[in-house]
Amino acid sequence: MKILLVSDIFYPHMGGVSEHIFHLWENLRGLGHDAKILAPSFGRNQPFVNENIIRLGRAVKFPKNRSLSAITFGFTLPWSIQKLLRREQFDIVHIQGELGQTLAYFAIKYSTARNFITFHSCHEGSLGYTLAEPLMEQYFRKIDGLIAVSTVARDSASQHFPGTYRIIPNGVDIREFDGNVKPLASLAKYDPKILFVGRFEPRKGLKYLLQALPRIISVFPDAILVVVGAGIMERYYRRFIEEHVKEHVIFAVNPPRADIPHYYASCDVFCSPAIGAESFGIILLEAMAAGKPIVASDIPGYRTILVDGKEGVFCRPCDPDDLADKVIALLRDRDLREQMGRAGRAKARLHDWPIITRQILDFYTEVLNHNQ
């Protein structure tokens, strides 16, 4: 099949949607399908330059849903997208994210293929969607298949776009994170090690992990927090660290993507203190694939993937003391950490990308056959 994956969010913008698109594209092509990605340019430094990754327009980031999103601008976008679709004659156009994105909007408007959309977001309500509903309704009717990565994402999307959704979760490439990945030699001298991976923005909750660190250090004086990511809050976090826990935090800002599994392999406990607006939690899957126990906020999106007491433990959102206590409890119990790591690896195998890709392909085929 000829398949076009469309999103205003893609590398170098880091996050779950970018990961999802890349791995789905990679696996579709691995199975012999002619899959391409349509995404905007984010500037001069574009990772994953490939003839099958088509960059149209320029992305501009803006705050949304306690995070950063992007919208694409370009005077010739409508004509360029129409020309692309006419030339390629795709069988499937698959929107990743939101119908209100610029590329998604024009791709659906001009598409003559079977159209799918995967909703990744979680929000209590969207003023933008409410205002744009009358405009988008005519194009939403062109969607042949609705996918959500979780029941949380489905419930969020169906507030504005009711319909029958297929739940197909996010995936993880277990080969990237398996037990053969070596820990980083530069971190070997630190013990114990706590890991945070994510964008430096309010909803990821790094602030609460930094506030929890003094309590953890009081029990484990040599504890180190390794912070992997990038974002708008970096300067704020660095100031906090300088004043409170300078010797106990190591920043790895925007490391090469290939290094991320090595950070997971190096840690004793993985921590994700997000405060909400998460529909799934790909980083939890990555930690599970790496065999690491997890301390995560007890929020709806994380409950879709993590079982409290099995692959990790929940802590109360926005509560540094409870977060610290849960981390301390795991650091004290090596056997429990190893048990949770094994359970996590078992769950991650169920979300391996070849399995998830097959579920998506089966849904494509089901819809194509139904509409013949």
Where are the regions a protein language model picked out?
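Conserved acidic donor-binding segment of nucleotide-sugar-dependent glycosyltransferases
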Residues: D308-G309, V313-P320, A329-R334
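Acidic anion/phosphate-binding donor-loop and adjacent secondary structure
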Residues: L127, D155, V172-L187, H262, ...
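Acidic donor-binding loop of glycosyltransferase active sites
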Residues: A265-S279, K292
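Carbohydrate-associated surface elements
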Residues: S41, V152, G171
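Conserved donor-binding/catalytic core segment of Leloir-type glycosyltransferases
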Residues: S186-P214, V226
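Nucleotide-activated donor-binding/catalytic signature segment of Leloir-type glycosyltransferases, i.e.
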Residues: R238-P255
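Short hydrophobic beta-strand element within catalytic cores of glycosyltransferases
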Residues: P293-A296, L306
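Short alpha-helical donor nucleotide-sugar binding micro-motif in glycosyltransferases
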Residues: N254-P255, H262-C267
